[in-house]
Design a protein with these regions (language model features):
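Bacterial Sec-dependent N-terminal signal peptides
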Residues: 1-22
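Residue-level detector of conserved, function-critical positions
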Residues: 19-226
Length: 226
């Protein structure tokens, strides 16, 4: 399985499956992917490695709807959130929480995932080169009340999440990245050179950040690093 295919497959799979779980509100995972010397393993909340760094790619422990709906009974059980998807030497596997490879991905086992995409309530709006936040399609730019957040940021991106009424929003201010809520309150301070616009908030209630644009790590909504 080639890396590019693996990335596309993993992202689409997790995106569909994670939105069906409404019980993990702001609870971070027990095991968190962390990279060391170019390889990824998993640490616990004490930042201790539980699964040694050995993978080229490692996702959060989460459901895989392609396997959950598989016609192959033996493969179906590995769609459980008890397992995580990893990639090593361009081959994708499911592993258990001890790091054991329990399943090697096979396209023949894949089933189609039902679409669970949620329409976002809020979206970024650009005016005069600055980004704000709106919750409707038709905006009167002269009416301040038409904006949820008046345009003032260099960039805004509404992160995918379980709660569309209270999204986390990646923002750029003074060329630094941070996270705000819909009221403009700072959740993650503007101290990072980059925050990845991926599904880490949806899947793990965490943000993948970097201070130098090269090395990335996860922080929770209290900006605690892992």
């Amino acid at each position: 399985m080639k890396t590019v295919f693996g990335l596309i497959f993993i992202i689409s799979t997790y995106f569909c499956s994670a939105q069906t779980d409404s019980t993990r509100v702001n609870k971070i995972p027990d095991l968190i992917p962390q990279k060391m010397n170019g390889k990824v393993g998993y640490v616990n909340h004490k930042r201790e490695y539980v699964i040694a760094p050995q993978f080229h790619l490692a996702m959060f422990f989460n459901s895989d709807c392609n396997l959950l709906n598989s016609q192959n009974v033996k493969a179906k059980k590995f769609g459980s959130p008890k397992y995580a998807t990893v990639e090593e030497n361009e081959i994708a596997y499911r592993i258990d929480k001890k790091g054991n490879k329990v399943y090697k991905y096979n396209k023949k086992d894949f089933a189609k995932c039902p679409s669970m995409i949620k329409t976002q309530k809020y979206k970024a709006y650009i005016m005069n080169g600055f980004f704000g936040l709106v919750n409707k399609d038709s905006i009167n730019e002269g009416n301040y009340k038409d904006f949820v957040i008046y345009p003032q940021y260099q960039r805004l991106h509404v992160m995918e999440g379980d709660d569309i009424n209270n999204p986390m929003i990646v923002a750029v201010q003074n060329n630094l990245f941070g996270v705000i809520d819909k009221t403009g309150k700072t959740i993650i301070p503007f101290i990072y050179s980059d925050i990845k616009l991926n599904y880490s908030w949806l899947l793990g209630k965490m943000f993948e950040v970097s201070v130098d644009g090269k090395e990335y790590f996860y922080v929770d909504e209290n900006n605690m690093a892992y």
